[in-house]
Amino acid sequence: MAVAVRALQEQLEKAKESLKNVDENIRKLTGRDPNDVRPIQARLLALSGPGGGRGRGSLLLRRGFSDSGGGPPAKQRDLEGAVSRLGGERRTRRESRQESDPEDDDVKKPALQSSVVATSKERTRDLIQDQNMDEKGKQRNRRIFGLLMGTLQKFKQESTVATERQKRRQEIEQKLEVQAEEERKQVENERRELFEERRAKQTELRLLEQKVELAQLQEEWNEHNAKIIKYIRTKTKPHLFYIPGRMCPATQKLIEESQRKMNALFEGRRIEFAEQINKMEARPRRQSMKEKEHQVVRNEEQKAEQEEGKVAQREEELEETGNQHNDVEVEEAGEEEEKEAGIVHSDAEKEQEEEEQKQEMEVKTEEEAEVREGEKQQDSQPEEVMDVLEMVESVKHVIAEQEVMETNQVESIEPSENETSKELEPEMEFDVEPDKECKSLSPGKENINSQEVEKESEEKEEKEEKEPEPQPEPVAQPQPPPQPLPQSQPHSQPHSQPQPVLQSQPLCQPETLPLAVLQPPPQVIQEQGNLLPERKDFPLESIKLPEVSVEPVLTVHSENKSKNKTRSRSRGRARNKTSKSRSRSSSSSSSSSSSTSSSSGSSSSSGSSSSRSSSSSSSSTSGSSSRDSSSSTSSSSESRSRSRGRGHNRDRKHRRSMDRKRRDTSGLERSHKSSKGGSSRDRKGSKDKSSRPDRKRSISESSRSGKRSSRSERDRKSDRKDKRR
């Protein structure tokens, strides 16, 4: 411990010497010793005088000095204020005027005219003439003018020289000021640093002094404990130290134990002392580190200020002298600005390029999407073409079947004008009701549908001319045998109701029915032996016939006859006006209708009144079915063209598959139902009634085999009938 104390004392002496050096440096800078502390009271007295600070004491001192010094008397303050002073001045002026007025009244001054008088023009002209005439005056004027010009030039030169000198002087003064400021800053920095060093040294001295004191105390404590170790310490507190007069083994053990305990205490105390000294050393280190950081920051600030001052000086020098360095710096600055502008421009160009790339990508994606849509449309176009071809084929099949039905009906019955004139009346009776219903529901569609039917008939005739050998097609037989009136109505209704409808459109009139083919009854199917397999396999489509209320017609009204005849004549005239081909098609259709009516008339003449009504109802249903089939083709084509315009290609495919399935199922159901209906009718009918259809069948077969007329003869007859009408 003695060694540690000596080392600390040596450090303390060194610190004191360094502190003395710092004080000497401060004395050199400031001119006074920092250790000389002046008393505060003396400072205050020197500053403020006996009054003790600012206030009335200083004023009293000043007044005393002014009064005693023999100088000018001090100005006395007017306590009344400025207004009173102004008023006093006015009063003094008035008094002075009053005193001077009587003197002026006594001595009357003479009135003098003004000395400023306008000179006459004649006199000035004379003077000018005199001056021009004198040569001496001219010379004198020239001399004076020359002197004036010379003096002015001299003044000008002197002024320019003075300005240059003033500029130089200003430059020198500015430089001196800058140098003085720099020196002053340096002095301040040195002074600050010295004072900071002084403070740091003082803190170090204090710490060293504390360490020395602690070390001395530790040494004293160690010396004291070294003496105590020789004694036995009691276990109880306060501890007592004793030594027995004679040592025994028990006391020897106690001495050893007490020495162990005391040594442990000494070790603990030494460790604590060392830790405390380390802590004391760490505190000034931290403070010194903080001070160093502050110094570094201050030095940086000073350097920045100096650089700013130098830059300002350079700028001023360059502006005043106009050296080449200014141009070089300006060029460098311009190059730097150009570089920065180039960098900014390059950044902007990069951004523009990125935007352009994004736009190009978007345009490419849009073009790809358009190409895909075009491919899809092209793929859908052949599907539409296939749909159109299928429609045309289906329409051809239906038209051919209609022609076969008409030809068979015409061939089965002999065309006679008398029978047609007689039997036209019941047919027109039955046709009036559906026409009325159609007009009430859709009167605007008759003309359109009639034109479409005429166009289709023209296409038929062209195809017939191109194809000389028509294919053999199934022959449609007339409908099942007629039965009495009470049973005819319920049988006609089940035929129309159970048949499923393929199209989802609302059927308001018979012209807008779907494509359909009349299914012959089972008895007729058995008799037809010359049917082709193609026609048997053809899928049969259902028909929704308009339900016509069939009533017994025993008396025919003349009014209905005239109305129906006029309608048929007007239609025939319109068709004759359009074209000859259309008139031919219309005449063929009218002849077929007349033939059907004549067949119904022949059957009705053989039976009673009830059988007549049933046969007429069957003929009307057959006629209406033929009309429905013709109109259904046009309506189906219209509906499909509309759906094609809407672009529901996928829906069409799905519907076609579903329609084909339904047609197959509906054809089977109809065959079963027709067979069931025929069997039920046979059971319900009596033996007498069942004999009548057998007669009719024999008549129709004989007429078929014996009497067949060519199409040309039929066309001629129809033309003659149209001309007669």
From Swiss-Prot:
Query: What residue spans carry the Low complexity bias annotation?
Result: 488-518, 584-638
Q: Which Pfam families match?
A: Pinin_SDK_memA, Pinin_SDK_N
Cross-link named Glycyl lysine isopeptide (Lys-Gly) (interchain with G-Cter in SUMO1), sites: 156
Give the record's GO CC terms: cytoplasm; desmosome; nuclear speck; spliceosomal complex
Chain positions found as N6-succinyllysine: 237
Q: Which UniProt keywords apply?
A: Acetylation, Activator, Cell junction, Coiled coil, DNA-binding, Isopeptide bond, Methylation, mRNA processing, mRNA splicing, Nucleus, Phosphoprotein, Spliceosome, Transcription, Transcription regulation, Ubl conjugation
Q: Enumerate composition-biased segments (Basic residues).
A: 563-583, 642-660
Could you tell me which residues carry N-acetylalanine? 2
Q: Which residues carry this modification: N6-acetyllysine?
A: 237
Q: Which residues form a coiled coil?
A: 2-32, 162-233, 286-373, 444-467
Glycyl lysine isopeptide (Lys-Gly) (interchain with G-Cter in SUMO2) cross-link: located at 109, 121, 136, 154, 156, 227, 279, 303, 310, 358, 364, 536, 544, 561
Bias (Basic and acidic residues) ranges: 87-100, 120-138, 278-315, 340-349, 358-378, 452-469, 661-672, 679-699, 710-725
Q: Residue ranges under compositional bias (Acidic residues)?
A: 329-339
Superkingdom of source: Eukaryota
BP-aspect Gene Ontology terms: cell-cell adhesion; mRNA processing; RNA splicing
Give compartment(s). Nucleus speckle; Cell junction, Desmosome
What binding partners and quaternary form does the record give?
Found in a mRNA splicing-dependent exon junction complex (EJC). Found in a complex with SR proteins. Found in a mRNP complex with RNPS1. Component of the PSAP complex consisting of RNPS1, SAP18 and PNN. Interacts with PNISR, CTBP1, CTBP2, KRT8, KRT18, KRT19, PS1D/PNO40, PPIG, RNPS1, SFRS4 and SRRM2. Identified in the spliceosome C complex.
Q: What does this protein do?
A: Transcriptional activator binding to the E-box 1 core sequence of the E-cadherin promoter gene; the core-binding sequence is 5'CAGGTG-3'. Capable of reversing CTBP1-mediated transcription repression. Auxiliary component of the splicing-dependent multiprotein exon junction complex (EJC) deposited at splice junction on mRNAs. The EJC is a dynamic structure consisting of core proteins and several peripheral nuclear and cytoplasmic associated factors that join the complex only transiently either during EJC assembly or during subsequent mRNA metabolism.
Q: What PANTHER family does this protein's entry cite?
A: PININ (PTHR12707:SF0), PINN (PTHR12707)
The protein's name in its UniProt record: Pinin
Q: Which organism is it from?
A: Mus musculus
